[in-house]
Amino acid sequence: MTDQIRTLQGRVVSDKMDKSITVAIERKVKHPMLGKIIVRTTKLHVHDENNECKTGDLVEIRECRPLSKTKCWTLVSVVEKA
């Protein structure tokens, strides 16, 4: 069994915290009865060591060990500046 490190891309929606950002991850799912494709959003708290992200940036994040009660993701890179 190989352990794969989960990486996701999302948009920064808040950078008000020190060394932390909130990232919104959008995914498309099919409604079970209607069959319509709908967009679901998940908000994650991400560790940003150097406070380099601003609201609106597109970022790549990686899962890591729990850093606090709500943070278990860390910033890999800024894909696109806002």
Curated annotation (Swiss-Prot):
GO terms for molecular function: rRNA binding; structural constituent of ribosome. SUPFAM superfamilies: Nucleic acid-binding proteins. Keywords: Ribonucleoprotein, Ribosomal protein, RNA-binding, rRNA-binding. Belongs to the universal ribosomal protein uS17 family. NCBIfam families: PRK05610.1, uS17_bact. One of the primary rRNA binding proteins, it binds specifically to the 5'-end of 16S ribosomal RNA. GO terms for cellular component: cytosolic small ribosomal subunit. One of its GO terms (biological process) is translation. Part of the 30S ribosomal subunit. The keyword Ribosomal protein applies. This is Small ribosomal subunit protein uS17. InterPro entries: NA-bd_OB-fold (IPR012340), Ribosomal_uS17 (IPR000266), Ribosomal_uS17_bact/chlr (IPR019984), Ribosomal_uS17_CS (IPR019979). PANTHER family: 40S RIBOSOMAL PROTEIN S11 FAMILY MEMBER, SMALL RIBOSOMAL SUBUNIT PROTEIN US17M. It comes from the Bacteria.
